């Protein structure tokens, strides 16, 4: 990566601005998944060990009007971070700018941390954070000593005041360890993979993955398709899909992708079908590709699991984004489990999960520790897989 990183700058005695991704699920004031906080610790600890004074920025959820602030304060995150760091984390509830915040920042000593309140509280008055208001970016940049560390891969595909805005107004904008690793794993996998390189794409909609499929058909040796989008590809070929999910307006796109794929695109050969999505009374495997009338496909079937297992044999690089079925339901998780197990058993494989539901599946189904890398950013990793330039990354200082 030809951008400066946190190791390229002198941090001692400096007020260092850091964009982290603490957008974690909070229920009744309790954090239900702290993975993103844990992922930011190496960068924060490094800054503190180097004698820097860390000023952290993050958003939490969507805030459009005053009422949305309820339950969106970063207060629980400040408490959780303090426990993880084993030291006090300064935090002023409800405050994203002003004299009180400036005084607290100026009072920081080397090795101390302050977390600014949810950056999206600034969205209440004209979406200043989300629309990258130039004055807000300039103001936040003025709170530090000319160094900005972006470690929020999860928002790197967005141009916000707290990442791109600050970057434009500091002497040096550098990557943190998490951002550096995310780019190294995902971009390298796509641009310079050890081959055979197999991509696996699941999820419900073809429309979400068109750009990714197109890019990966050029870069990968094989692209395996599963999940709900299977049925749009089926229908495009005239295969019966019963009541399965389909995007009627994407049938032409699916047909064009199949033609362009030249045999690289591998579809399931059977499904696990049910007679309803939720209150079903019958679940069975289809004979072949066709889904029975009155049924809908909710997972790939056993023949598909075997076919995908075979397609993955010998793979050296695997990128997986999107589950094979409705994995949250035990009746429809065999496909996702089967594919995960097929990936991780390959000797010497570099296995990467592109965030989102696939990451949740690996964690919930106990396979997370077997993968080389699990991305913290669903949308950002998708855009990297699509070959797009991420604004948050582009805004960093060149080496």
Swiss-Prot record:
Task: Answer whether the UniProt record assigns the keyword Kinase to this protein.
Answer: yes
Q: Which Gene3D superfamilies match?
A: Phosphoglycerate kinase, N-terminal domain (3.40.50.1260)
Output the GO biological process annotations, alphabetical, semicolon-separated: gluconeogenesis; glycolytic process
The answer to whether UniProt assigns keyword Cytoplasm to this entry is yes
Record-level GO cellular component terms:
cytosol
Please state what class of enzyme this protein is.
transferase
Listed binding positions for substrate are 21-23, 36, 59-62, 120, 158
Q: Where in the cell is it found?
A: Cytoplasm
Q: Which Pfam families match?
A: PGK
Pathway membership, UniProt: Carbohydrate degradation; glycolysis; pyruvate from D-glyceraldehyde 3-phosphate: step 2/5
- On the tree of life, the source organism's domain of life is Bacteria
Q: Name one GO molecular function term.
A: ATP binding
- To which protein family does this belong? Belongs to the phosphoglycerate kinase family.
Q: What is this protein called?
A: Phosphoglycerate kinase
Which species does the entry assign this protein to?
Streptococcus gordonii (strain Challis / ATCC 35105 / BCRC 15272 / CH1 / DL1 / V288)
Q: Which lineage?
A: Bacteria, Bacillati, Bacillota, Bacilli, Lactobacillales
- The encoding gene is pgk
């Amino acid at each position: 990566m030809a951008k400066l990183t946190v190791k390229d700058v002198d941090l001692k005695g400096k007020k260092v601005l850091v964009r982290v991704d603490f957008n974690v699920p909070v229920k009744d004031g309790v954090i239900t998944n702290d993975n993103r906080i844990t992922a930011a610790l190496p960068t924060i600890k490094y800054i503190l060990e180097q004698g820097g004074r860390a000023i952290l920025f993050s958003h939490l959820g969507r805030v459009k009007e005053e009422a949305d602030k309820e339950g969106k304060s970063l207060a629980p995150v400040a408490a959780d971070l303090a426990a993880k760091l084993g030291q006090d984390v300064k935090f002023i509830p409800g405050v994203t700018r002003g004299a009180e915040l400036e005084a607290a920042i100026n009072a920081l000593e080397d090795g101390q941390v302050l977390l600014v309140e949810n950056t999206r509280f600034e969205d209440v008055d004209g979406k200043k954070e989300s629309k990258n208001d130039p004055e807000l970016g300039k103001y936040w940049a003025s709170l530090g000593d000319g160094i900005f560390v972006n470690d929020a891969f999860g928002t790197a595909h967005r141009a916000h005041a707290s990442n791109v805005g600050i970057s434009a107004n500091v002497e040096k904008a550098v990557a943190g360890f998490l951002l550096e690793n995310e780019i190294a794993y995902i971009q390298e996998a796509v641009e310079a993979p050890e081959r055979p390189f197999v991509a696996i794409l699941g999820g419900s909609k073809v429309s979400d993955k068109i750009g990714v499929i197109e890019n990966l058909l050029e870069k990968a040796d094989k692209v395996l398709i599963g999940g709900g989008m299977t049925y749009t590809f089926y229908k495009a070929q005239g295969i019966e899909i019963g009541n399965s999910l389909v995007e009627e307006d994407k049938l032409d796109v699916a047909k064009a992708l199949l033609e362009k794929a030249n045999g690289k695109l591998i579809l399931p050969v059977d499904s696990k079908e049910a007679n309803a999505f939720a209150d079903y009374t019958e679940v069975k495997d289809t004979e072949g590709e066709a889904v029975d009338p009155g049924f809908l496909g909710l997972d790939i079937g056993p023949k598909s699991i075997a076919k995908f297992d075979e397609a993955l044999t010998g793979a050296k690089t695997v990128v997986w984004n999107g589950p094979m079925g409705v994995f949250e339901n035990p009746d429809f998780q065999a496909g996702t489990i089967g594919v995960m197990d097929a990936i991780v058993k390959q000797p010497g494989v570099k296995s990467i999960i592109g965030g989102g539901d696939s990451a949740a599946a690996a964690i919930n189904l106990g396979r997370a520790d077997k993968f080389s890398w699990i991305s913290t950013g669903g949308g950002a990793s998708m855009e990297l897989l699509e070959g797009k330039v991420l604004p948050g990354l582009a805004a960093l200082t060149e080496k």
